[in-house]
A protein has these predicted regions:
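Extracellular loop and loop/strand-boundary signature of outer-membrane beta-barrel proteins
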Residues: 2-6, 19, 42-50, 86-93, ...
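Conserved catalytic-core segments of large NTP-driven translation/proteostasis enzymes
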Residues: 135
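Structural signature of Gram-negative outer-membrane beta-barrels, strongest in the C-terminal barrel
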Residues: 7-126, 173
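Gram-negative outer-membrane beta-barrel transporters
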Residues: 26-27, 144-194
Length: 194
């Protein structure tokens, strides 16, 4: 008589966040804040005992500058901390993903605010991001490993109503994602989006 292995997991995620906005000049504003997580996960997964407890605070900061009445520049930075749902080869949850994001760009309004254009450049680094590593032949459960990836890209967008009969909404995004060895990573994610 065999014994069936099962999963019975209880998890609690509590987020705390706060921010403050400062006007440095009439044209320049700064926002700073944090996003904190208290995370607890206990139970059993296919025979493996699960007992995780994590707490982490991630800061972020950003600034905007009104170049003209219709053109604004911005820059932002944030830390990343995200618990994961994927298991490793031993049936344990992967440790959280940690990293940092940076973005800079412009937003401009044209034709009496009827057309909005944006351009953004972004880059991110993530450590311990879940990547498929195989299938357990006994349980048929997928397992994953944590990898480090770097991504960068840009986005261009046009949106607005130029006339009563002409509305435009167009965008293009390009992203490059590489692992520690410089190989393409996250191949499931599109590299060009129109």
């Amino acid at each position: 008589l065999g014994v069936s292995e099962y999963s019975n997991i209880e998890q609690t995620l509590t987020r705390y966040f706060g921010s403050a906005r400062f006007s440095v000049t009439d044209a320049m504003h700064i926002i700073a804040g944090f996003n904190a997580i208290d995370f607890e996960r206990t139970g059993q997964n296919a025979g493996a005992v699960i007992d995780n407890s994590e707490s982490e605070a991630s800061p972020y900061v950003g600034a905007t500058y009104a170049v003209t009445e219709d053109v604004n520049a911005y820059v932002s930075y944030s830390d990343v901390y995200q618990p994961q749902e994927q298991y490793d080869v031993n049936g344990q949850y992967l440790d959280p993903t940690k990293g940092k994001n940076f973005e800079a760009g412009f937003k401009a309004q044209w034709f009496d605010d009827r057309l909005l254009t944006t351009f953004a450049y972004f880059t991110a680094e993530q450590d311990n991001l879940a990547a498929y590593a195989g299938t357990n032949p006994e349980t048929l459960q997928y397992y994953y490993k944590g990898v480090s990836v770097e991504s960068d890209g840009f986005e261009i967008e046009l949106a607005g109503q130029l006339t009563d009969d002409l509305r435009i909404n167009a965008s293009y995004t390009n992203i490059d994602v590489e692992d520690e060895q410089g190989n393409d990573a996250n191949l499931w994610a599109p590299r060009d989006v129109v």
